[in-house]
Each structure stands twice: as C-alpha cells, then as structure tokens.
C-alpha cells in the first residue's frame, strides 16, 4: 500500500509533468519507491482524483498509510486558532490552561459537533500540540518565537532586502470585507431593517510586483452553497451532499477560491491551508517566492513549515502594504460600477417595457425617459452575482496600477519599478473610474443617492485585526452547508434559549381564516406571500425613503410623479383596464377569496395581504412572478427578460406603503389589546347565539377602523345619525331581532376576547341597512337566497350571533400564557446549565425537565395560535365603541318599529345608492 508521502510525491510529479500518462506515473513510482509491483492504472486514477487532499496534507500526516479523520475536529480547529493568537500576542499558556480552554470550547459548540464527554486528557493535549509543532514540555517554560513584524520606520531595511528579489517572485496579499448586496439607494441603507440584511463576504487578493501573476481571488461567504447557485446548475440533485457541492462548482466556473463559515471571515486555518496548497505546487516546479503581508489575526500562524514560501510580516496599524495605496479602492470602484450598471439596465428595461405596453394600449401616462423606483428586494445582489463581479473587477485592474501602488508604498527602490508615466509617492486614485462612478450615482434613479466617496470607505468593510474572542472563534469555525430558506414559515418547535419568544408560533395559524384583501391604486397589490417574511421590514424601508425626499442630495421625485402614479394604478389589476380607480374593483378581489361559505371583501385605502404579512405561505408561486424579475435574475438569467410578451408593469415599483405604525396598530399583540378590554369586565355577560360569519365581519371592521389615524385617514360615520334616519323612514325591525342593552355591553366586552368562532357551518344571509332603511348594495360576497322573505334573519340577528361560544376570560388566557413562557424560559436556562455541567443533575431529573419543557411549548403553541387567530378582531377599542353605538341605535329602532321592515328577496334587487359607506368609497360591512 502506498503511504501518504508516496501519494503526495506522485501528485507532485503529475503537477511537474502534466503531459505524463497515468501509466508513466505508475512506472515512475515503481522505480522510485522500489515497489514490489507496478501500481495499476486504476490506483493512479483514484489517487489523482483526490490530488487536492494529498497536496494539502500536513507534515505529521505523511508517514501514515491512510488519512484518518481526527475526533473533535471542530474543537481542534478552534483550539488551534486560540493557541496561535495567544502565542502571537505573548499570552502565557500552559497545558492545564489548554485543557480548560478545550473543555470550554467543547461546551460552546453545537451539540451535533461534539464528540466524547468533553474531557481532554494531558495525552490528548500533547498529541494535539505536536501536530502544531509545539513542544508541550518547553511550552510551560518558554513561549515559541513569533515572526518578525516590520514597522513603517523600518522600511529602508526592507528596501535593501527586496532589491535582491526578482520582481516576478515578490508577492503581496491583503483581504477586506465586501458588502456585496449593499443597497445603492442611500435611503434604504439608512433603514435599520435593511442594514441587518446586508451580507458581507471576505475577499483576498494576491499579485506579484510586475502584475504578471494575479492569483484567483479568495472569497469567504457564510454558506457552502447559496440558493442562487442553482441558477447556473439547475439540474443538480437536491440531496444535501450535492447541494453542498454547488459552492465548489461555482468557484470552479468563475475561477475563484471559495470557502465559508458562519462569520464569513478569513481565519488562520483557512489561510494556512491556502499557503500549504500553494507551497506544494511551488515545490513541484522548484520555485521560491516571498510574500509581503500584514499581521492581522487571520495571518497569525505559529511554527509554519513552508518549503518554498517566505512570509514578510508588516504592521497592520501602519497600513503601508501596496494594495492599501489604491488597488482596493479601484477594486471596489469597479465592483460598484458593475452594480450600478446592472440596476440602471433593469430600470431602463422596465421603463421601455411599460412604454411599449402603453403604446400598444394607446396609453401615454409615462413620458419618455421616466424611470421607476426599485425596492431593496429587486435591487439586492446574490452571491452568484458577487462571484461574477469580483472576478471581473480583479481581472480589469491593469498591471500599471499594481506597479504604481508598489512604488507608492515606499517598500522598493525606485529603480525596481518602471512605469509608462511618472507616479508620485503620494496616494493616487483612479480619477477616471471615480468620475464614472460619480456619473452612475447621479444616473441611477433613487430616493437618495450615495456619495461615491462613501461607497469606498464603509465601516462595515473594515477587516478585523484585533484579538478574537472565544465566541467569535467558535462562530468562525462552524461551516453551514446550505443557505436556509427564509421564505418558509418557522416551525413551532424552534425556540431559542437566549431569546424565548412565542412569536415563533405565529405562523402556524389554521388556513380557515378569511383572507382579507384591500386594494387602492396608490399601493402595491403584488405583495406576494412567498416574500411575506420581509413585509414589515419593507414597510419601514418605504417610510425611511419618504423621510429623505427633502434631502439636498436626493433626486427630484416630483419630476417622475406621473410615471410612478401610473405604475401604481397599472398594477392594481392588469387583467381589468376599465373602471373608476376610486371605486372598488370587485373583479380583482375575487381571486383573493378563500373557500369559506361566507367571504367578506372590504374596499379600503390599503392594499395589504394580512395572511402574507403573517407569513402564511398560502399562495406560493410556481411560475416566475414579478419579484423574480430583479437585478439578480437579470445578471444570472438575462434570457427571462427577452420575451416579447413580458409585462414588467408590476416590477421594480417601490410603493409607498403605510408607515410601520399602521401595522403595529393592526397587528398589535393580544396582550395589549386584552388589557384594554379588561376594563369592561364589570359589565353583564348575557349569552348570545354564535355566528362565524359576523365574528369575521367584526374582525374586519375592527381592523378597518383601526387604520383611521394613518397617512391616508378616513373617519368613522356617525352611526347614531344613520340609524336615526332609519327609524324616521318608516321602516321597522322585527321584535325578534331586538337586543337588550346588557347583551350589547356583553358583546362590547367579549368581542375583544374571542378565542375561536363556533358553528363554522352557519351561513347567515348578509344584509346591510343604509341610511334610508333599505338594504345597502351587497358587498358581502355570499349570495342571498332568492326565496328568502321579510322574515329572514336580518343583519342585527347575524351580529347578535357573533358573540356566543366565548372562550374563558382573555385576562386569564394571557396570564396563563405569560406564566407558561416564564416557566419554559426557566426550564430552558436550567437545562442549558446542566448541559454545560455547571450544575449537577441526575439523568432522570433532566429527562423530567425536558418532558415538562416540551409540554409547555405545546401549550404555548396552542395558546399562541388561538390568540393569533383573533389578533385582527380585537385591535381597536374605538371600533368597539362605535359598534356599541351602532347596536344601541339599532336596539332603540327595533323597540319602536318591530314589524315594518321589508327586506328584498334577491341580491339583484339591492338599490345602488345611499350605502352605509365610510369616506373614500369604502363599505362598512
């Protein structure tokens, strides 16, 4: 059997003689290693298939016959990082300290990465240090020596040293953070909700002095595989192994080196492996090189054994590396130019598509040259886009720019560098590129533009140079195989110990809830539920954009009002081109109704999909939708934009949704709402019949009335006046429909604490009474039986039936919920400490605690679902007051005119005027 050393040498010969056949390699191995027989062609083939593994093996592994996976691999990686930076910073460490640190690290890592019981013996520590080439017997007495770190004042010594090195063999490298999906609308960047969604990747660049060798960029992301990678490999299997390999295939496609960890940081382990791999190839061609780098934490390696690479460390505080003198600014400038060009291209395509569509329909609402705003979801780049832009930006940096930066750094004698033009020793920027970037900043239509100088000096793009904490070391060592799917609803059992929140159960509502849809021409109707997890954040973003309209550096939005308004109106219903925009569009709302017996559709001032905002994935798109036509798709799949029938009227419109305060009112927590309702507990509680339909009607009415104080307010009509007109008109209500005042008070109290509606099969005939006493135009979608007579149940009877089947007091429910939450948090803390061996508990006790903990989670989940189903019903105390006024007036009218009300027998006979409407053509029921 071939040893690791022999396999490594065969791989070296394959690197040195790429034209050799596998048979020639086998003969060479037979003669060189004095083997008993010639290795077979299959043996050489399998060996070369794992060439990267054998080329990256460490010195202590070469004597073995096979590579074995060590136990507690993650602990070893973290401990190696910790020991390296401790020794580098002169912190004394001993074997007992290393043992305690290893045990602490073992308890910090996730349970799936743990092996053994967390106990590390002296022998284990000794073997571990020997693989790092650290003698444990000497470690207790004297720290290993670290490499020399050169300061800026010592650069004259470096000049004399570097003057003896051939320019092609003198390299430099440096890394920096790159916020690859940075929003180029500064108003979006200022929104804290969007800042949390900005992703950062680490990019390392390396080149020699004369620019003849520019190594492929090293990129470190957060996941081994991103969802966007499937744009280039759509036919790959969906199993976890194939999914995790997409990152390697993407790196090979774009000719970059890709790695990942949770922090997206370049660690010393990754850097060490990268150096070892390069050193093996240099040994194969018998070439020696020198690398100039800084002493940041990711470069700190102890006892690095490299044969053909010499590292020259400089102080990271002085920042006199060549790349700091202009290469990084030029790289970022070229990256942002590509990003701006892609966004401007998307805006132009949308505008051109809509203009062509208008011409075909003889609609000239958008003047030529007008553009539309693009939301953050449409403008953010993915990692696959970043790969493409990073590679192109690095390849486009000219050789003279690299030479000029070497000369400006002052590390080399002037005679070593020959340029086509004189370059001063001062810092020199690429003024041509910066002028292009500045022009694109002005050309891109947005709420508030970036200053191009700020784009090159972001705080989030400053790399780490300090001592890393243990928690940071743990996070930077864990590798996540695949990017999580944020579009799916969270699972109910996903509870975090450190931040226990019952809101994780909010997405598990039953699907029998009515889907409320409101439409208005000035708000985006394409609020798709598959992107609903970002709904609230998008609302804050729109609010942030509005607040910046008056900024001095912002674009003039008023110049494009006509285009934006047209886009907003055009997106209400693409299939319906007629009708008054101010009137309810019933046809556009038919598709939003669910299959319940009685469906309620209310025409309001806000286009909000409540189930979408609650992350209810009831309408997952199977085909490409408007949100699929974004800048990322334009970069990865430009063919999607070539269809002549493509309609982009619903794409890229950054609609001005209501402010975040509106949603906080509509979706306020059940606790706050029930505290308001608790003040009415002293009222009588006469039991009334139940009706699911009117319970739903009450919830919609409550949500509608709650929005009256927002940016586009509408007032609540005077119900007493309306009902008094009804009594004056000569019509009367049947005495069987009369409701006592105690019952009305009971309804006011209990309507804020309904836990669940009973009798879902009841289908009352929905009728609304207008100011003249005649039934209003039907807004409730359930058909009215043509055979019904005047004795049919009236609207008041339906309203009376909405309050039966009440759950226990809302105060009691919420009190029990809060108690369960507190107990669950306490049990979670206890089990966490027990798992870390901070407290000693028997196995039976831990099992009992775990059983109780899971039982509490189920109770919390059930209660949370119960409260969430009524969250829209109980949001407004003011709505309850108006409803009480309505019912009180109705009861008074019923007492005086009991048998004079004649209702029509068919929905087609309903009159078209004098509806009970809210201002803004919005029906109350």
Swiss-Prot record:
Bias type Low complexity, positions: 538-563
Basic and acidic residues composition bias: residue spans: 674-686
Other observations noted: Present with 572 molecules/cell in log phase SD medium.
Compositionally biased spans, kind Polar residues: 513-537, 565-596, 904-916
Residue ranges constituting the HTH CENPB-type domain according to the UniProt record: 63-138
Protein task: Essential for the synthesis of pyruvate decarboxylase. May be important for a high basal level of PDC gene expression or play a positive role in the autoregulation control of PDC1 and PDC5.
Gene3D superfamilies attached to this UniProt entry: Homeodomain-like
One GO CC term, this protein: nucleus
Upper classification of the organism: Eukaryota, Fungi, Dikarya, Ascomycota, Saccharomycotina
Keywords: DNA-binding
GO terms of molecular function: DNA binding; RNA polymerase II cis-regulatory region sequence-specific DNA binding
Protein name as catalogued: Protein PDC2
Region (Disordered): 510-596, 674-693, 904-925
């Amino acid at each position: 059997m071939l040893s690791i050393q022999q396999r490594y040498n065969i791989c070296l010969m394959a690197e040195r003689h790429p034209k050799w056949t596998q048979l020639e390699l086998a003969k060479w191995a037979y003669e060189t290693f004095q083997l008993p027989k010639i290795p077979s062609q299959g043996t050489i083939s399998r060996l070369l298939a794992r060439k990267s593994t054998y080329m990256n093996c460490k010195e202590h592994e070469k004597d073995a016959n096979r590579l074995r996976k060590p136990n507690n691999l993650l602990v070893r990686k973290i401990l190696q990082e910790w020991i390296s930076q401790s020794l580098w910073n002169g912190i004394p460490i001993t074997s007992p300290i290393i043992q305690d640190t290893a045990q602490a690290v073992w308890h910090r890592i996730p349970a799936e990465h743990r092996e053994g019981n967390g106990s590390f013996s002296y022998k284990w520590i000794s073997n571990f240090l020997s693989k790092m080439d650290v003698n444990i017997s000497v470690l207790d007495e004297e720290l290993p020596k670290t490499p020399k770190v050169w300061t800026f004042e010592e650069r004259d010594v470096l000049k004399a040293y570097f003057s003896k090195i051939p320019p092609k063999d003198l390299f430099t490298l440096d890394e920096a953070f790159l916020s690859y999906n940075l929003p180029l609308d500064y108003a979006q960047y200022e929104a804290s909700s969007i800042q949390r969604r900005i992703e950062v990747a680490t990019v390392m660049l390396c080149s020699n002095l004369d620019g003849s060798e520019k190594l492929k960029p090293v990129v470190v992301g957060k996941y081994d595989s991103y969802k966007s990678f499937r744009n280039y490999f759509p036919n790959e299997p969906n199993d976890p192994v194939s999914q995790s390999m997409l990152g390697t295939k993407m790196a090979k496609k774009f000719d970059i080196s890709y790695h990942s960890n949770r922090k997206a940081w370049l660690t010393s382990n990754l850097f060490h492996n990268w150096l070892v791999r390069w050193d093996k190839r240099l040994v194969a061609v018998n070439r020696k090189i020198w690398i100039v780098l800084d002493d940041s934490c990711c470069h700190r390696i102890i006892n690095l054994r490299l044969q053909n690479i010499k590292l020259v460390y400089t102080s990271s505080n002085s920042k006199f590396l060549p790349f700091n003198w202009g290469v990084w600014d030029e790289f970022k400038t070229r990256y942002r130019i590509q990003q701006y060009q892609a966004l401007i291209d998307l805006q132009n395509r949308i505008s051109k598509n809509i203009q062509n569509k208008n011409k075909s329909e003889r609609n000239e609402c958008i003047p030529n040259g007008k553009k539309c705003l693009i939301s953050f979801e449409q403008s953010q780049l993915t990692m696959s886009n970043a790969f493409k832009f990073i590679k192109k930006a690095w390849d486009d940096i000219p050789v003279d720019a690299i030479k000029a930066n070497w000369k400006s750094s002052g590390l080399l004698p002037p005679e070593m560098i020959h340029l086509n033009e004189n370059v001063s020793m001062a810092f020199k920027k690429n003024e041509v590129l910066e002028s292009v970037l500045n022009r694109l900043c002005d050309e891109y239509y947005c709420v508030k533009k970036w200053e191009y100088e700020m784009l090159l000096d972001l705080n989030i793009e400053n790399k780490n140079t300090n001592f890393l904490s243990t928690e940071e070391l743990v996070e930077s060592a864990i590798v996540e195989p695949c990017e999580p799917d944020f579009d799916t609803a969270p699972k109910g059992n996903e509870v975090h110990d450190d931040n226990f929140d019952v809101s994780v159960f909010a997405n598990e509502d039953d699907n029998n809830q009515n889907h409320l849809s409101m439409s208005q021409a000035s708000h985006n109707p394409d609020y798709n539920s598959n992107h609903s997890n970002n709904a609230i954040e998008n609302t804050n973003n729109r609010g942030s954009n509005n607040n910046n309209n008056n900024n001095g550096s912002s674009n003039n939005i008023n110049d494009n009002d006509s285009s934006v308004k047209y886009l907003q109106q055009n997106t209400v219903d693409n299939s319906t081109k007629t009708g008054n925009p101010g009137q309810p569009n019933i046809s556009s709302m038919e598709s939003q109704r669910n299959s319940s017996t009685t469906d309620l559709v209310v025409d309001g001032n806000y286009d909000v999909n409540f189930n979408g905002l609650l992350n209810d994935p009831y309408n997952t798109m199977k085909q490409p939708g408007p949100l699929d036509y974004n800048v990322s798709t334009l970069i990865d799949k430009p063919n999607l934009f070539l269809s002549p029938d493509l309609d982009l009227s619903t794409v890229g419109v950054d609609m001005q949704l209501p402010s975040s305060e509106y949603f906080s009112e509509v979706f306020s927590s059940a606790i706050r709402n029930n505290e308001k309702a608790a003040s009415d507990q002293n009222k009588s509680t006469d039991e009334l019949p139940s009706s699911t339909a009117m319970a739903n009607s009450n919830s919609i009415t409550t949500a509608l009335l709650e929005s009256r104080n927002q940016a586009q307010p509408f007032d609540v009509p005077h119900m007493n006046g309306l009902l008094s007109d009804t009594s004056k008109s000569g019509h009367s209500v049947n005495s069987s429909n009369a409701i006592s005042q105690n019952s009305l008070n009971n309804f006011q109290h209990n309507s804020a604490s309904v836990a669940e509606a009973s009798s879902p099969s009841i289908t009352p005939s929905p009728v609304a009474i207008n100011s003249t006493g005649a039934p209003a135009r039907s807004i409730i979608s359930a058909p009215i039986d043509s055979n019904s007579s005047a004795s049919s149940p009236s609207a008041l009877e339906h309203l009376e039936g909405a309050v039966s089947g009440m759950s226990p007091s809302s105060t009691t429910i919420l009190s029990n919920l809060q108690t369960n939450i507190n107990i669950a948090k306490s049990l979670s803390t206890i089990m966490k400490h027990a798992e870390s061996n901070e407290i000693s508990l028997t196995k039976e006790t831990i099992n009992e605690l775990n059983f109780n903990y899971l039982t509490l989670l189920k109770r919390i989940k059930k209660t949370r679902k119960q409260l969430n189903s009524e969250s829209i019903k109980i949001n407004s105390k003011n709505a309850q007051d108006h409803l009480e006024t309505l019912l009180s007036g109705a009861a008074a009218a019923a007492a005086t005119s009991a048998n004079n009300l004649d209702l029509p027998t068919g929905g087609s006979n309903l009159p078209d005027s004098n509806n009970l409407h809210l201002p803004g053509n919005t029906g109350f029921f």
